[in-house]
Design a protein with these regions (language model features):
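A general structural motif
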Residues: 2, 66, 90-92, 140-141, ...
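Short, well-ordered alpha-helical microsegments
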Residues: 15, 79-81, 102-103, 152-154, ...
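Conserved N-terminal alpha-helix of the aminotransferase class I/II PLP-enzyme fold
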Residues: 34-79, 100, 108
């Protein structure tokens, strides 16, 4: 069988040595005699996986100790609801809509309060990032939301917008760990 290389958005090519290690550990993870999929999520072996993942992520991303690292299920779509449910204290948020994911986040936020579309590139099928140099940030907005990298349309924020002191919520699921984040 010849290898097929997938360079599309989402799952992509992995080195063969990584695939072989995963295959070897599928039946016996780290000498435990079982697969990770068979472990209790309360076991010491599984807790070690979580602790190591958090330690490595903190190191790679330079995450300070006063920040929490959460490993959550549900993916980006669940976060579209969790963000306004947890951050929309004044029931107002501003959204910069630059693609399908930001549009979905904006639509979901409307269920929890007033979501303002303060900039958008939907007029040209999300083919550009709008000028964010002087955004009409709502005085009572709890946060400003962006999707930092749009894999569907091939657009990306070159610099983060000035949110005038408001919390910036950035969906970075498609390019996390590709650059330093402050």
């Amino acid at each position: 069988m010849s290898r097929v290389y997938n360079f599309s958005a989402g799952p992509a090519v992995l080195p063969e040595e990584v695939l072989k290690e995963v295959a070897d550990e599928m039946l016996d993870y780290n000498g435990t005699g079982m697969s990770v999929m068979e472990m209790s999520h309360r076991s010491a072996a599984f807790q070690e996986i979580i602790d190591t993942a958090e330690k490595d992520l903190r190191e790679l991303m330079n995450i300070p100790d006063n920040y929490k690292v959460l490993f959550l299920q549900g993916g980006a779509s669940q976060q579209f609801a969790m963000i306004p449910m947890n951050l929309m204290k004044n029931k107002v948020a501003d959204y910069i809509v630059t693609g399908q994911w930001a549009k979905k986040a904006y639509q979901e936020a409307q269920k929890y309060g007033k979501a303002n579309k303060i900039a958008s590139s939907e007029d040209k099928t999300f083919s550009y990032i709008p000028d964010c140099s002087d955004l009409p940030i709502s005085p009572d907005a709890d946060y400003v939301y962006i999707c930092e990298n749009n894999t569907i349309y091939g657009t990306k924020f070159k610099e983060l917008p000035n949110t005038k002191g408001k919390i910036l919520v950035a969906d970075m699921s498609s390019d996390i760990l590709s650059q330093p984040v402050n």
